[in-house]
Amino acid sequence: MLRYVLRRFLLLIPMVLAASVIIFLMLRLGTGDPALDYLRLSNLPPTPEMLASTRTMLGLDQPLYVQYGTWLWKALHLDFGISFASQRPVLDDMLNFLPATLELAGAALVLILLTSVPLGIWAARHRDRLPDFAVRFIAFLGVSMPNFWLAFLLVMAFSVYLQWLPAMGYGGWQHIILPAVSIAFMSLAINARLLRASMLDVAGQRHVTWARLRGLNDKQTERRHILRNASLPMITAVGMHIGELIGGTMIIENIFAWPGVGRYAVSAIFNRDYPVIQCFTLMMVVVFVVCNLIVDLLNAALDPRIRRHEGAHA
């Protein structure tokens, strides 16, 4: 298992490096001048002398490979530069906004797990009957409706007409319900449908038939033989959804005025705050690859065949 963990971890390094190169080049070779944006956000006149000194200060007068090496070296030491807008270290700003984003993403993840698992099991138990049709309809809505559109519908229904929940802001538990549901709905619909399909597929396999012939009742067979094997695809999906939840907060946080990293990143994009954009994009890459690593390790722990397969190809 240790060899498998090391192998998976070493594969992350070239992935993150390749992503960092793409991020850097997209921002450096894109339209606009970082020096001009820095002066604009600092309320300084963009005279030729100021532009030249700003380019020197930001290192923009150096070759691209030198700029990238300097940025990567500082990023490895958690130095992502100074925000053009706030004139504060980017990492400090990120850490200030991160708790609100983690709170929202955590609430959405709990909602996904508490709803998708029971819905998937319920649909699989009542295949081609009313509960199954209801869950499949919910799944259809979830994959068809963008989260920002669902957010507007929830605000209109529960904030404008019924006035049960606040439309925006950050405070008590009432403020987190609508944004958490908006982020979680698509993922819980996908997971419920995936668990249903996995359970039905496993239920038709030979070892489940033999378990029933040995005298196990339906609940014992489901718990011991079906759910364990059917949970592997869902674990993979949940791991992917964790990164999507954090990335999906960008739009939702702006709709609900939630003071998180996503709202901060959108503001940086509009202001062309290059250090913040670079930091946020690289952070999202790291979140996705770490989530993939955790999912791979969980799958390997639950299914020894994965470890044996990796060992055979080592």
Curated annotation (Swiss-Prot):
Biological process terms in GO annotation: nickel cation import across plasma membrane
Superkingdom of this protein's organism: Bacteria
Membrane topology: Multi-pass membrane protein
Membrane among keywords: yes
Cell compartment(s), UniProt: Cell inner membrane
Membrane-crossing segments per the record: 9-29, 104-124, 137-157, 170-190, 232-252, 275-295
SUBUNIT field: Probably forms a heterodimeric pore with NikC.
Protein name stated in the entry: Nickel transport system permease protein NikB
Species assigned in the record: Escherichia coli (strain K12)
Encoding gene (name): nikB
